[in-house]
From Swiss-Prot:
This is Glutamate-pyruvate aminotransferase AlaC. Transmembrane segments: none annotated. GO terms for biological process: alanine biosynthetic process; D-alanine biosynthetic process; L-alanine biosynthetic process from pyruvate. One of its GO terms (cellular component) is cytoplasm. It comes from Escherichia coli (strain K12). GO terms for molecular function: L-alanine:2-oxoglutarate aminotransferase activity; protein homodimerization activity; pyridoxal phosphate binding; transaminase activity.
Amino acid sequence: MADTRPERRFTRIDRLPPYVFNITAELKMAARRRGEDIIDFSMGNPDGATPPHIVEKLCTVAQRPDTHGYSTSRGIPRLRRAISRWYQDRYDVEIDPESEAIVTIGSKEGLAHLMLATLDHGDTVLVPNPSYPIHIYGAVIAGAQVRSVPLVEGVDFFNELERAIRESYPKPKMMILGFPSNPTAQCVELEFFEKVVALAKRYDVLVVHDLAYADIVYDGWKAPSIMQVPGARDVAVEFFTLSKSYNMAGWRIGFMVGNKTLVSALARIKSYHDYGTFTPLQVAAIAALEGDQQCVRDIAEQYKRRRDVLVKGLHEAGWMVEMPKASMYVWAKIPEPYAAMGSLEFAKKLLNEAKVCVSPGIGFGDYGDTHVRFALIENRDRIRQAIRGIKAMFRADGLLPASSKHIHENAE
């Protein structure tokens, strides 16, 4: 007899919308099953090898029988001291390794657990739009309500941020930021964080900053840390992950520093949820942070070369995207002839007709629907192949004459 009982519903899960990236991922896999060669720019998943000295350290320490037990939720003391030295050497910022630093299982876990530890049902959280999905949905999962603050060209972000603080009820408890930005590659200077900290103190709002792309910077630019602002630790914490800087995405290790109360809150909830990450991974992370940083510069240089090929090729096709000065992404405004499609349908079109997979901007928030995101995870030959596919699509649509390399519509 068929089970006629209604399907169980789970309120926390029901608050999450369908994951838009799954749509393009499923279409990509279906195309590959049909034998189609899809150039994949969709996910920011580093394709390079982890530097050998880090792998060797992991293997060496993993041979020791005393490293296979439970670790500690805060992270081993040696790694926390290495984190403190990293901030001192890089930003001239003192971090107390005992009370102001905690190791996380990648930044995504740390962000989600921090929000679960500190947000109550009905709390208001301010998040730029567009933004990295965990910044939005970590708060939603924790039971908070998210108020979007437009982070788009032509809009004064701080005017919108202050208006959101004044007009929100209940008063916002937290704002979540990430620069250099995923997905937009937008960068800010230290003055931006000075204004954020001043605003946060004025209105008693906590600040969480995600510094995932601190090292993926180009053309001599350097990414500031919010912790460089005097008094930032009164209201702010900052996350860093080794995923991008050291090609360690699958290793799942990062850290959070800053406000002692927030560090303590994250440590408390992690003491219930986990025993920290595998000790040999933490020792390898020390080797990463304290070893020769030429490997980090080499990884950034590889992304720069890919960026240059992609942007040059898109410009040749008349798709006048902006040249990012940081991150591993190109945030591309949809060309005007396709603008009415929206980002999801345009991403489907690129997949079907150009054999190029990108992330639709709508997946990062409503204000992202005018753009698609390219992740620089394919080599330069594959990027050139993608450009040929995009040009072929433009030609088929009458936007690029067969005898010309350029289209002349306004794609800004």
